A protein has these predicted regions:
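Active-site bordering "gate/hinge" segments
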Residues: 1-377
Length: 377
């Protein structure tokens, strides 16, 4: 009988494995450096910068209305959130109160965007897991949401719905559009129910992702994690509960406790019905009146800040207004603070789970790459 020789600690060599900048499981280009010992990740480093477009710098000196339109280009998934928050900055600084009907339409657009983002998350996560059927199913359900966004905003990616004082008249909701939205929500509700029954309740799938990429609650708070990734650790924090725009709507804040891939997946599955609930309330109680107030006047303002809750967490916009133009624009997206969680989640897990640990945080590196500071040029 041959005695098995156990390797000494000195025999284990740390290996660096690089993934990216282009990788089959990545929706966007970014680089991941994994430092591995015996196929277990000991350290992870995510490098961004490939998607840099300098949007904040381009906004400098532009007329406020034009700069607001440019913010849509920050992110193709959360385009509505960016222009909405940028418009909110101007409205807060200029003291503009928009018509309630316009606010309801903005909420409908934002929750539709949250739906399509969460379905994209489920589709991408299923693909990384190797379940192509579930991935295609999520994309199929998402298509209903995309068509509703196209119907209201005129495009499937960038809608340009929000403007200073309300929403564009072309985004007005008539009876036909309201009926289409109601029917669409019925279809999406049926779709997510079937998806959950077949995917979330599958013991093979759940056993594959349970206990993987764990982010403890204390660590999540320390890393300043935001959005569903933070709520997946048990922290009951959703900025929508503090936003006056959401005061007319009744919905629940979803939380999970384990902070692993399973908890993050369940977060999105369970948040989808809440968004459907908000949209149904909005179309049922849609106020009458105008969708835009054009009686406002432009004047100089010091730096104004605005925070809103978007599909990935807290989005921050700020700028000052001088002679009707934007000054000192700053945008902070949720993925900027969540990068630390993505790196932490990889540590201690097998190398084959590394990309899954990153995907669970729903990264969007394109919106994170907005500005670049060059030191000692």
């Amino acid at each position: 009988m041959v005695e098995e020789k156990k390797p000494n600690k000195q025999d284990v060599i740390e290996t660096e494995i690089s993934m990216g900048t282009v990788h089959p499981t990545a929706l966007e280009p970014y680089r991941v450096r994994l430092f591995v010992e015996d196929e277990i990740v000991k350290e992870a480093e995510i490098t961004i910068g490939v998607n840099h477009r300098g949007i904040e710098r381009i906004m400098e000196g532009l007329p406020v209305e034009k700069a607001n339109s440019l913010t849509e280009k920050v992110c193709g998934i959360c385009s509505n959130a960016h222009i909405w928050n940028s418009v909110l900055v101007a409205e807060k600084g200029l003291g503009i109160e928009i018509p309630q009907r316009a606010n309801y339409i903005r909420i409908i657009m934002e929750e539709l965007e949250r739906l399509h983002s969460h379905f994209l998350y489920l589709a991408h996560g299923s693909e990384v897991l190797g379940h192509e059927t579930f991935s295609m199913r999520a994309f199929y359900i998402r298509e209903t949401v995309m068509e509703l966004l196209r119907m209201i905003g005129g495009n499937r990616v960038q809608y340009g719905a929000s403007i200073i004082g309300g929403v564009r008249p072309r985004c007005e909701l008539n009876e036909m559009r309201i009926q289409k939205i109601a029917e669409g929500m019925d279809d999406v509700e049926k779709g997510i129910t079937k998806f959950a029954d077949r995917f979330v309740l599958d013991p093979i799938v759940m056993s594959r992702i349970e206990g993987i990429g764990v982010i403890p609650q204390k660590q999540a708070i320390k890393l300043e994690v935001t959005g569903p990734t933070l709520r997946a650790t048990g922290v009951n924090q959703d900025l929508r509960m503090k936003m006056k725009e959401y005061e007319p709507f009744d919905f629940d804040v979803i939380t999970q406790d384990d902070g692993d891939v399973k908890s993050n997946l369940l977060m999105r599955v369970l948040e989808i019905p809440e968004s459907i609930k908000i949209i149904r309330q909005a179309i049922k109680n849609l106020p009458s009146g105008s969708v835009v107030d054009r009686s406002w006047e432009m004047f100089d303002c010091n730096t104004i800040k605005s925070y809103i809750e978007v599909p990935r967490g807290t989005l921050y916009h700020s700028y000052a207004i001088e002679d009707g133009r934007v000054r000192n624009s700053v945008i902070r997206t949720p993925s900027m603070t969540n990068i630390g969680a993505m790196q932490y989640a990889c540590i201690g897990d097998h190398i084959t789970d590394a990309q899954l640990c990153i995907v669970q945080c729903d990264p969007c590196f394109t919106c994170t790459d907005r500005a670049m500071k060059i030191i000692n040029l």
